[in-house]
Amino acid sequence: MEIEQIFKDYEQDEIVKKFYNQLVYLKNHAFILDTTEYKSNKGEWEESVGKLMRIYMRPILTIYIDLSNTIYYCYTSQNFHSLEVIFRTLMEHHAQVLFTKNKKGIDFLKLQGWYYSNLLDEKKSTEKLVQYDDSYKEHYKLIKQMISKPLYKKVKEIVKSGSYWYQYFNYNEKNEKPSGVTNLVSNIFGKDFKIMYTTLSRSTHSVDFNAYRREENYYDILLSIGTEILKEALKYFRYEFD
């Protein structure tokens, strides 16, 4: 569903209005220095939030649009895989910028989520490894470089700073193999960051579990985490806030 349609359909919803206002705030307070890859476009703000990405062509704003689609797809359909998409999107766009600036010419989008864990932690991966060629060895080096950046250290502080993180994401006790994205996040945030044993496992999606999360303002928490992460990402890419 297009994000502008979501806002239209749910314009009276307080959570939707809250997120829309956050997008407006982001547009009004963020800027990026001109670079060879991404030149500033000072075009006027358009009412259609869905056009924001096309107007500015800024990777982090793209993340924000993707995040908004994810949250409100989750909100309207009760699909609870949004955390995976948030982190995957954040990683992919950051890596695309990194690759572009390094002029490596690598098609990063060929990498799917499970590749990340294989490249980051070859020995411990629970997935079947692919045949590595020179391009994937290059991916490995660049991804290792990517996750060592200050942005991810700050993100780690954000998501682990509140007690609600463990309150909401420590429910699944089943011994299941983690997904690639989960392995990636574990490599970045530490082995005690047990996402797979929580929201990313489809087996946790019982009616009672979902109802509990709705009652406990799950979406407000998700929005708060996503907003703080993206603010830090904006600063990292030379955006500034008043």
What are these regions (language model features)?
Residues 1-49, 114-242:
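Secondary-shell segments that build the walls of catalytic and ion/ligand-binding clefts
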Residues 101-105:
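Predominantly late transmembrane helices and immediately cytosolic-facing juxtamembrane segments
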Residues 107-115:
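Intrinsically disordered, low-complexity acidic/Ser/Thr-rich segments used as protein-protein interaction/activation
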Residues 54, 58, 88, 110, ...:
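Arginine residue identity/basic-tract feature
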Residues 40-99:
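Long, hydrophobic/aromatic-enriched structural stretches that serve as scaffold segments
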Residues 81, 85-93, 113-114, 217-224:
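Amphipathic alpha-helical scaffolding segments
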